Regions:
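Core catalytic alpha/beta fold that binds nucleotide/phospho-ligands
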Residues: 1-259
Length: 259
């Protein structure tokens, strides 16, 4: 898993470098959207590291499902081995990669983002009744707003992992129940309740802060491992087009939850 933040160079310079890593069709598609252009190129540079047949980031090509979910088209060895998902928010791009071919979904948001003065009104429109009720039980406004953003991020990661997207699986039609541990990190544990899910894919979640000093929060959704738990999550960090660096908890790779 990798994150990138464009603090060390101008967006225009990053976009110029990114253009060299996308196809002509992609340049046309992404014209005027530097963030998506950089994210697309960054995904290629991350994915190529997982396959020895990819000599250049441009060797990595993508296919898209009926609802827009991306997958690796080539090289064939990479397509068979890796599933991936991409999200970006306020200068941070997150790329999730599985190395066993499983699907995954990732979403990143600023947990300090405020959607308006009335979180409850927004929740009633978009979330399930149980989720809205649980949010309303949180007394402190800031804590309730942060909980909303974490929940939204988790739900987004699920619909991306499933390939359905928000249009195919409206947020109001499934629940994510959560508990908050009494530890210093206020660790969340989450349980998906989707009545249309046939149970063939036991989805698990990891809710992460890639760096403790920043307000971004990421949710990763992927199938459970052999032990029924979330597979091991490895967090890596990079500036755009630079080598990836492993991040451990002591250096800011803080994990909110994995369950």
């Amino acid at each position: 898993r990798a994150g990138t933040r464009g603090d060390d160079a101008s967006e225009n310079e990053l976009a110029r470098r990114a253009e060299a890593l996308v196809s002509e069709d992609e340049r046309t598609e992404l014209m005027g959207n530097a963030t998506r252009l950089i994210s697309r190129a960054f995904a290629r540079t991350v994915l190529m590291r997982y396959d020895e047949d990819a000599r250049d980031a441009r060797d990595v090509t993508f296919a898209y499902g009926a609802r827009g979910k991306p997958s690796v088209r080539g090289p064939a060895t990479l397509a068979a081995r890796c599933g991936f998902s991409v999200s970006h928010c306020d200068g941070l791009t997150a790329v999730a990669v599985t190395t066993n071919g499983d699907a995954c979904g990732i979403d990143v948001e600023d947990e300090n983002r405020r959607i308006g003065t009335d979180v409850g009104k927004f929740a009633r429109r978009w979330l399930s009744d149980d989720e809205t009720r649980r949010l309303s039980d949180i007394v402190a406004d800031d804590e309730r707003a942060r909980a909303f953003m974490r929940l939204w991020t988790a739900k987004e990661s699920y619909v991306k992992a499933s390939g359905l997207g928000i249009a195919g699986r409206p947020f109001r039609e499934f629940d994510i129940a959560w508990d908050v541990a009494e530890d210093a990190a206020k660790t969340w544990s989450m349980d998906l309740r989707d009545v249309t899910d046939d149970g063939t894919v036991p989805w698990r979640f990891a809710l992460l802060k890639p760096r403790a000093s920043q307000s971004h929060v990421m949710s990763l959704c992927a199938p459970a491992g052999a032990d029924g738990r979330m597979p091991r999550v490895r967090v890596r960090w990079a500036s755009p087009f630079e080598p990836l660096v492993d991040v451990d908890a002591a250096n800011g790779g803080v994990e909110y939850a994995a369950g």
